[in-house]
Amino acid sequence: MFVKIYQYHIQHDRVDEYLAIQEKVSKIYGKYLDFHTMYLNSKNDATKWIEITRYKDEGEYQKSLHFINQDQEIQDLFEEFQSLLLNDKNEISEEDFNFTFSMKSSKIKGEDSF
């Protein structure tokens, strides 16, 4: 499996817009890829978000990304997303990982396992 992790800061009063954008982006990505995304909001800094997405493999991701990036709606949504970033913390960090393994406790109940 292939994992992408993004970190960024969203203006605290624009979180609803952020979530709406992410929902639209997910629908577009879903046309091309199978994926699972988790959005984490820091308990210490309400503006800090981490986005973790798991894909089947990097090759499938790279091949699909070519088509996704040609979609005008994706370009427009990315511009909208950038407008939600904090002015003084407008950087988006991105890192790639290979998924190695996971462990799960049977006592933890959640919506979906990552």
Regions found by a protein language model. Give the residues of each.
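Acidic/histidine-enriched, glycine/proline-rich intrinsically disordered or flexible terminal extensions
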Residues: S93-F114
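An amphipathic, aromatic/His-enriched active-site/gating alpha helix that lines ligand/cofactor pockets
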Residues: K24-T37, R54-S93
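Short, surface-exposed ligand-recognition loops at beta-strand->loop->(often short) alpha-helix junctions
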Residues: H9-A20
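Short acidic/glycine-enriched loop/turn segments that link adjacent beta-strands
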Residues: N44-T47
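Short, solvent-exposed loop/turn elements at beta->coil junctions and helix N-caps
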Residues: M38-S42
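Active-site-flanking beta-strand signature of metal-NTP-handling nucleotidyl enzymes
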Residues: V3-Y8, I50
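A beta-strand edge to alpha-helix "cap/lid" segment located at domain peripheries
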Residues: V3, Q62-K63, T100
